[in-house]
Swiss-Prot record:
Keyword annotations from UniProtKB, A to Z: Cytoplasm, Methylation, Protein biosynthesis
Gene Ontology annotations for the cellular component aspect, listed alphabetically: cytoplasm
Subcellular location: Cytoplasm
Similarity-based family: Belongs to the prokaryotic/mitochondrial release factor family.
Protein name per Swiss-Prot or TrEMBL: Peptide chain release factor 1
Mod. after translation: Methylated by PrmC. Methylation increases the termination efficiency of RF1.
Length: 360
């Protein structure tokens, strides 16, 4: 391993021990904000510190085995130990490189998930419903909470658009690669000739930001309209103008929220989604400005981004970004998404590692 990387790991290991000592300090325990921040830092450093300790131990084992090679009686055993230790050292070095990759500060956050029907009319709305169900199943399996913020139902089922907040550990980091265009190829229920139709939906995943980090929005830049909500809600539906539509005039971003009966709650929800959308637009703009020649696996949520194709007649799902095809469509639609998410996360890590070695 390069001396520069070893030096970096030693510094992180020392910081881990320092933070551990600080967490036992009565003054820090009394300061809840500081204690929480240090607890987070400790958790982030724990894996790299533990892995580095294991790596150091293996280097000692290699040294011991090499010394034993000089003893004819011990040579055979030493060779076997040396081979095993070198293998383990390589594995730990790979793990450490991944642990050293720059972390996206948003990865641990909750996320807003938007699914929007694109080309394909009723069939696109039905597919948007299928996609939302797929993500809900995935969230359920990971014990995440799904809260619908706003939805507009399709005429024959599904959704023209649905926005949900997904809360839990590492939601954004896991779902961020879902942003982009999703195509479906299947025979619609209304198709009498049995012809396969192609429809499309767009998915956008944005981190939920803490209030302190939300972009500054000038109230003068907002147009706020109220209207009567439609959809489920029993006797209270259409009796009050509780639904909210907020338009951010400088960007043209529009957010509607009609899920709550209270206008204030709908407004608060709509503003949090608006803040996340503005932040996402600014981030995308920044990434484009830095736009390296390196490919960006993170979709923009744009229809032109073709992430995946779900082909029902063939039972096939294809991720076009990494040329991955699986004939496991039924499982995918039931929310078993790790087999699609994991390869793209690994590909992203490989790209980051390549960038890191170029810098060095």
């Amino acid at each position: 391993m390069k001396p520069s990387i070893v030096a970096k790991l030693e510094a992180l290991h020392e910081r881990h021990e320092e933070v551990q000592a600080l967490l036992g300090d009565a003054g820090i325990i009394a300061d809840q904000d500081r204690f929480r921040a240090l607890s987070r830092e400790y958790a982030q450093l724990s894996d790299v510190s533990r892995c580095f300790t294991d790596w150091q131990q293996v280097q000692d084992d290699i040294e011991t085995a090499q010394m034993m090679l000089d003893d004819p009686e011990m040579r055979e055993m030493a060779q076997e130990e040396l081979r095993e230790a070198k293998e383990k050292s390589e594995q730990l070095e790979q793990q450490l490189q991944v642990l050293l990759l720059p972390k996206d500060p948003d990865d641990e956050r909750n996320a807003f998930l938007e699914v929007r029907a694109g080309t394909g009319g009723d069939e696109a709305a039905l597919f948007a419903g299928d996609l939302f169900r797929m993500y809900s199943r995935y969230a359920e399996a990971r014990r995440w909470r799904v809260e619908i913020m706003s939805m507009s139902e399709g005429e024959h089922g599904g959704y023209k658009e649905i926005i949900a907040k997904i809360s839990g550990e590492g939601v954004y980091g896991r779902l961020k690669f879902e942003s982009g265009g999703h195509r479906v190829q299947r025979v619609p229920a209304t198709e009498s000739q049995g012809r396969i139709h192609t429809s499309a939906c767009t998915v956008a995943v944005m981190p939920e930001l803490p209030e302190a980090e939300l972009p500054d929005i000038n109230p003068a830049d907002l147009r706020i309209d109220t209207f009567r909500s439609s959809g489920a809600g029993g006797q209270h539906v259409n009796t009050t103008d509780s639904a909210i539509r907020i338009t951010h005039l400088p960007t043209g971003i529009v957010v509607e929220c009609q899920d709550e009966r209270s206008q204030h709650k709908n407004k608060a929800k709509a503003l949090s989604v608006l803040g996340a959308r503005i932040h996402a637009a600014e981030t995308a703009k920044r990434q484009q400005a830095e736009a390296s020649t390196r490919r960006n696996l993170l979709g923009s949520g744009d229809r032109s981004d073709r992430n995946r194709t779900y082909n029902f007649p063939q039972g096939r799902v294809t991720d076009h970004r990494i040329n991955l095809t699986l004939y496991r469509l039924d499982e995918t639609m039931e929310g078993k998404l790790d087999m699609l998410i994991e390869p793209i996360v690994q590909e992203h890590q490989a790209d980051l590692l390549a960038a890191l070695s170029e810098q060095e």
